[in-house]
Structures are given as C-alpha cells and as structure tokens.
Amino acid sequence: MLARIREVVSIANGSTSSDPESKRQAIEYFEQLKNDVQSTEIFVSLMTDEGSDDLMRFVALQVVCEQIGNGILSQAQLTFVRNAAIELLRSKVNVPNGNLKSTPEYIRTKIAELVTRLFYVLYQDQWQSFFPDLTEILQIQSLLENPNENFSLIGIDYFCRICVFINSEIADQTFVRSKEIQQKNNDLKDQMRVQDVQRLVTIWINTLKSIAPNKQPDIAIMIMACIGSYISWIDVTLIVVPEYVSLIINYLEFPETKISCAQCLCEIISKKMKPVDKLSLLSLLDLTTKVASFDNSVDDVDISEQLARLASAVGTELTIILEQCNEANPPTEESQQLFSAADQQILLQVIPLILKFMLHEYDSVTQQSFQFISQYLAVMKKMFAVGGKAGSVVAVNSKRQSLDSAHEEFLVSLLQVCFKKMKIDESCTEESVDDIEVFCESIRSKLKVFQDTVAVINPQIFLTNISACIQNLINSADWRDIELVIYQLHNLSESIRNNLFGLPKNQIINSEPSMIMNNFMRLLLDNSTVFQMDSSYVQISFFELIVRHYQFLSFSGTKDELSLLNIFCSPFGMFNKREKTRLRTWYLFSRLLKTTKPKFPISVLNEIVGKIAPLLPIKVYSLNNDGVEEDSIFESQLYLFEGLGVLIGGNTDSNFEILNEILTPLFTDLEACISSSQEQPQVVLQCHHILLAIGTLARAVHSGLVPENRVNNALVSKKLIHRSLIEKFMNIAEVVLVTFSYFSKHETIRDASRFTFSRLIPILSDDIVPFANKLILLYLESNLKMMEMSDFLSFLGQMIHMFHKEQSCFELFNNLLGPVISKVHVLMTQIEQERNGEENPEWNGTTLNKGHGSNGKNIIITDAFRDKMLLKKAYMGFLQSFVTNNVTSLLLTTQGREVLPTILNDVLEYTPQEIQELSVMKLSLNVLVNFVKFFGSGKCTDPEDMYAASIEKLDGLNEFFITKVIPLVFEIPFKPEYKFNVREGSCRVIASDLSRLLLELYLQSGGGTSIDTNPCLKYLTEVYLPMVQFPPELIMDLVQNLITSNPKSFEKYFVQLITNFTA
C-alpha cells in the first residue's frame, strides 16, 4: 500500500514520465484515499517516516490536515495523529547541531498547519495543556522564566509559525464565517485569554530580548508578526508597557526587521481604545520622531513605503481622536483639551513627516499618506469650511471657525506638495502611455480631491495658490509644465462649475475665480510657445480644455473666434503628424462648433473650408478577410463634415453656395464609383462612406440653421430654411436615389441611403415626398434582411410623424401601404421557413425556464423566433405611428381596405410563444385597443384625424371585431396551451391590456346598459360565454362590471376574475 501511494504521488506530481491518462487515474485514486478514513494511519506513517522525501512528507501532511479539517476522523484517530505530530515536532527540534535549514520552510509551515488543525479540534476539551506541552516539546520553556540563550531556535521557529496559524484560524476577519464557526472562534479566544495569552506574550518578549536582531532576523520577523496579529484581540496592556514598547521599537534600527517592526507597530497603534488612552499610547511610542530619524537615510523603497504607512497610521489614529472628541455631546473641557493635544501632535509632528513622504520620488510611497490626509481634511471641513454649495452637507455641518495660522500653513504646504506631485515625472516620455495613465488614476486624481477639499475649506487659499502655480508655469518651455498648467486650469474651471467657493449663483459669472479663469485662458491662447510643443499630451489636453470650458473664452468678436479655429486647423491640431492627436482634434472641433454655433460671414467660411478641404476626401484602404476596413479614419472624418455643416448652416449671409465646395468632390467620387465596371468591395464601401458623409453634413447644416430647442419644429424649419438650400438638398436626394438604384443589392448602401434620407427630411419637409416615394419603392424591390426591414419600418414611422398633416404624405402611404405590408409578410414567411428548417432548436436557440407556480414553462427560443419577434415589434411600431399621428383613416380608404384584413389578423392572432414576449405583446395589444377605439364601429372616429370625415363607414367591421376580439380576450388567459399565469408580472400586464380591449369594444359597440342594443354585450351573453360554459351568474356579474366600471376598476375586476378561475 505504501509503495502504491508513493508511486501515485510520483505520477500525479509528474516526477516520473507518464501519459495524461495515467496522471488522471493517479489523481482520482489519490482523491479516493483522502476521503477514506482508513488511509489516515498510512499517511501519518509517510509523514513521520524518515525515508519519505520532502514531496512525500508534504503530501502526507496535506492529506492529514484536510482530513482533520473535514471532520471525518474519530476521537481515537485524532489522538493518534496528535501523538504522531508531537513525535514529529520532537524529531525536528532534536536535529543535530540545531540546523534550522535541515527542513525546508514549506515543510515547517505545513507541520505548523497540522498542529493548528489539532489545536482547533482538541484545545477546548481534550488538549487544554496545548501551549504548555508545546513549549516543552519545542524546548523553549526557559523563555517563560527570563531572556536566555538556552532555548531551541528551531523550536521558537515552529512555535511562531503555529501562533500565526492559530490567529489566522480563529481571528482573521478577511473571510466571512458562519455564525456557528464564529462562535467557536470567539470561545477559543476567550479560553486562550484566560489560560495562555500571558504565556505567549512572555515567550515572544523574552525571545526578542534574547536574540541578536542582525543574526536571527527571521525569528524577530515572526515574533513581530505574532504580536501584530494578536494585538487586536488580547489585552493591550500585556504588550504596551514602556519596556516592551522600547524593545519592539528598537527593531526599527535594523534594515532586516524595519518593515516587520513597522507593520507590528501599525497594528499596535490601531488597537481600539478610549481617546485618552490612545493619545497616551501614541505619546509613549513617539513614533514620528523615530521615523523622522530614518527618513533621509532609507534607500529601500519597500522600507520607505512601510515607514510612510506607519507615519500615516499615527496621523490616522490621532484624527480618529479628533473625530471622537467632535462627537462628544455635549462637549466637555476634557474632550476639548484632548482635541487640542491631538491636533497639535498632528500639526507639529505628523504633518511635516507626511508631507515629506508625499514628495517622495516613488508614487508607491506617496500613496501611503493619502488615507491620513483625507481623514484630516474631513475633520478640517467640519471645523473651518466656508465654501461649498449653499445647502450642501459641508456648508450645513461646518462650524465655520476662524482658520488659525498653523492650519493655514498646513493647507498651503499641502497645496504646494500637490502641485509638485501632479507634474508628470521627468523619466516619462511621450511613449510612457501606461505609466502616465497609472499615475493619473492613482496619484493625480487623489491629489485633485485634496485640492478641491482645500477649496471648500478656504476658497481664498486655494485660489491664491493655484493661481500662483499656473502663473509660474504658463510660460515654461517644458511640455510637462504646460500639461500641468492645462490640467490645473481644468481643475480651476471645475471648481467654479461645481461652486466649491460657495458663491451665490447670480455672482459666479462675475466672481474673482471666473475673472482669473478668463485671464488664464486668454494667456494660454496668446502663448505661442504652447503651439510649438511637440507633445500629444499638451495638444490633446489643450483642445479638451478649450472645448469643455469654452464659456471662459471672452471673445471680443469674429476675429478672436477665427483665431481659435485657425489653431484647430493647424499642425498643432487637425493636421497633426500624430494620428491620435489628429483624430481627437477632429472630434473636438465638431463638438466645439455644435456647442457654440458661431456665426461667420461667407468670406470667413471660404477660408475655413479651404483649410479643412485636404482632410475631406474619403478613401477606402485595405479590407481584411471579413470585408471590414482596416485602420479606417472615416468615422472621425464624419466629425469634420458635422463641424463644417454647423458653420455653413449658421453663416450670417444666408449663402449656401459654399456647400458646393464640399458636395462637388463627393458627387464626383460617387459618379466614379457608379461608373466603375466592377462592384468591388472597396467601391461599395466608398459609396457607403460618401452617403453617410452627405447625411451627416445635411443634419449639421440644419442644426446650425435652426435653434437647438426648435430642431424638430417643422414650422420653424420652414421659416428659416431658404429655397436655395432646399434645392441643393433636393439634388442630394436625387443623387442618393441614383446611387441606391445602382447598388441596391448591397445592404450597406441601402442602410446609408436610409440614413441620409432621414437627415434630409427636416430640411426638405414635404418636398421630400416624391423622392421618398422612389426610395420606398426601391426598398420594397430589394432583398431586405430582418434588421433592415425593422429599420426601414422605423424610417416610415418617422415619415408619418413628420408629414401626417400633409396631403401628399397621406396619398403616398395610401398607395404604398399594401406593398409595405406585403413585404413584411414575405420576410415573416422567410423567417418561418428558417425556423421550420431548424431540425434541433434546442441546440440553435436558448431555453427559457419560466417555471412559476402551477404552470412550469420550458420555452425554446430559437434564433428564427427571436428574429420574427424583432420584426413584429418593428411592424407594430409602424402601425402604432398611424395611431399616435392620427391617420388611422389610412386603413379605411379604398386601398387601405384591401390590406386591412391582413393587418387585423396580425394584431389578433398569437402563438403561445408570442404570449411570453411582453414588449411585443404590450405594443401589439395597444395597437389593437386603439384600432378598436378609433374605427371599431366601422367609422373613423378620431377627432384629430383630418381625413376622417372623407372616409365612408366600413360596414361589418364592428361585427368582425366582436367575433374576433371577445374570443381573444378569454382564450389567452384561460386556454391551457397559452400557459398564462396572471400571478407573473408579464401576464398581469397582458391581462390589464385585455381588460382595456374588452371595455373599448363594448364602448365602440354603442355602450349603454341594454344587452339587446349593444351587439358586444349580446354576443358575450348569448353566444360566446354560454358556448364556453361560463357560469351564468358570472356572465351577469361580468356584464354588470363592464357597464358600470371605469377603466381602472374594470381592470382590477378582470384581473381578479382570471386569478379566481386559474387558482
């Protein structure tokens, strides 16, 4: 058996050459052994056998640890393991010459884990002498008496490892434990406090006194780890006595133990205490003095980090004292004295040290100070803040005490440190993108928060110092300085925008901060050195600043605005040699113009267009195997067309001939594409790009011409748009149609054509109708895909919305409604055929488990079904546009009546799967309800429909609705195949819509209380409900509620009726 286990371990570990199958079998066999309690003795023997190599011993230890932890061992087996562990420890301690390295560290750690597992299950009842036995076994009992050299270094090594493991097991707060385990851990700690903690502390302290730190640093480090981990739950007075504290602090002197000692001290001072006791402890330790003595002599970054963390921890604990004193209610003389003493320690001892660490060349050291600075500034806000928005938490809670010179000096010093650390490091170059990004996220962003807090505490200090910082650097030739200037200008502007200065709203624009910001923006724009800097960080951040904070640009006229645009149109910006800068500037150019909408005469526009013209040619470069363009800049080019469109639309001369300068090259390229003998992918894609550019330009011209809040107002557009512009865009529409007709089989061209037409609508208004007629016909002749048809239906809905009051539009849709509905059905049929072709839908789709209550559902949602629902949703949205735009009379015209039966069947028939698609069902039922409302009687009764009066009544339509709607209303909730559960939210929504539908049908059938005169009531009571064996008393109850209830009440009644029947 032993030999077999050794072989299995060797195979599983890959120590011998074996195939994967053998390894798999070995691992499976090994797992079986771990769960077999009969294997414990075997693994214990392997654990203690001197013939076992380190790997075998480690595996054996691991298995036994898991078996103890899993609780599968009997009491006798635990006793057996304990005895074996004791003998194993004895053998390790009795190594000749006491060689600590004779056993690898990972084996020592695993032995310590095994002993800890035994402690956890035996200490409370069976092994209460655990620690006395351990000191005897490990030959360290002499340390209980006094410091001496007559103890085993190997023994103290094991002892410390076991102590650390025990703390991790019973006191580590990193992991969430069950209530039962937490209670047991608490009981173990209580028992240790009573029986053994004093013993542990004595051994730790006497060990520190006995060893030479520079010779046994590993032992000292483990002792520090023990003290630091146990201090949170043992009596602090066992450790915090002058002799012991001095002993521990002394280990800061040695490079090998500096970090562990600092970590230990951090844990000690973080111990929860009363404020007066904590202040006494910190005064006793005087750690800041000690740390300050090392500050200039430490070269190791890790040590500097830990010392900074220690100094910050001292400051944080003093800040907690301040917070606790502030919370004293009512304040006492003692709390005020305590507050003053703690605050003085912070100002005189902690802050000078913290500010030095903040200025450290390594950011990882700087970061250690952030927690303290953040907490201390929070206390200062409560004491001194005079800024912040009126009514904000800061403004309300501040005591608004006068800022004394010591705190003022701190704020000024902190700002100066922030300014220095915010600068990009000298070692960073343009290529150090990742390093600079990390710096901005981890350091600069935190320092900005500190700046903002200072602004709230004392706006004048912030304003004075940030102004001096900007003024001192703004003329620098170093790109890092200018980048910082721009960053600080952004911060200053944000502080004004967020009103950190606490100014009344009506005074912000003329306030001192705003005036200073205006002045600096002017200085920046006038600084020619900036525009000669070859740095993408300066270039991009400059334009970001200008665009985001343009309100601080105090232009005196067109000349200043043109000067700014010339900066954009320079090698510093839009013609930059770096693509990253170039493309970003194109976007910012468009954003600035869309935001500011400047007005220039045509002469100026000619100059601007002439400068940008070289960037406008649209080229298609190489395509990958998927037909996708590689390294495309086209999407960024669209921003150029957008920006130019806004400028042209807003020109002060109302002269739009300049559009030819942009459109003519595009038309020429389109003509070349159309004339091309082969429809190569590059040619088609170039046509697509050109159409999108034209559409983008058109929309931007309209945006520049019409005020932002009137963009969708057709009357305003008609008033402002000149006939010359309309003619140009009619020409564009014709060009689009020609392009579409040549490339109609390409989806990208169809999409681009629809995109462009959508953007021509606001400008051309009803003049677009004849062009739209041709476009729609071209679309209907094309082989459309599902998503295309959905988008096309949305486009038609937009047309109806824009022109529903135009006679020409009414006639257009009157003629095209039949072909459109026919096209929808063709696509629906194609999708259905695809669905039927899915031989195994479980593999092609998604299973939705909708089990709830008594109607467990297992619906298969295939890709084809999903496509069908998306198309139906677009179709219903198209029909809904007839309702919302008051043109339902279209469905009752001579042409409309031909397609009306098909449309009504589409809104009256549903499959069980469709019932589960809430968004589609809700839209579809809403369409049906409105159809019944507006022409359920056979006559169009919509008072807002301007064509209703000219449409004759359609006889028999009311009877059709009655015979179709009433079965629908009752079959959906009651037929088993629909698996309708009204208790589900989605079904409840559908039930509410069905109640609305039934009530509307009753009203459109004449209303009233007489069954004989209302065909809906007559069909309900005499035909349908008796046919489905509805109880007579419930029939009359339903009719009574239908007659007397308002919509809300009937909805509630109907939902309850379904609930009662399906319970």
UniProtKB/Swiss-Prot annotation:
Subcellular location: Nucleus; Cytoplasm
Gene name as annotated: LOS1
One GO molecular-function entry: tRNA binding
An individual GO BP term: tRNA re-export from nucleus
Function text: tRNA nucleus export receptor which facilitates tRNA translocation across the nuclear pore complex. Involved in pre-tRNA splicing, probably by affecting the interaction of pre-tRNA with splicing endonuclease.
Principal cellular location given in the protein's record: nucleus
Protein family: Belongs to the exportin family.
InterPro entries cross-referenced by the UniProt entry: ARM-like, ARM-type_fold, Exportin-1/Importin-b-like, Exportin-T_C, XPOT
One Pfam short name: Exportin-T
Protein's UniProt name: Exportin-T
A GO CC annotation given for this chain: cytoplasm
Keywords: Cytoplasm, Nucleus, RNA-binding, Transport, tRNA processing, tRNA-binding
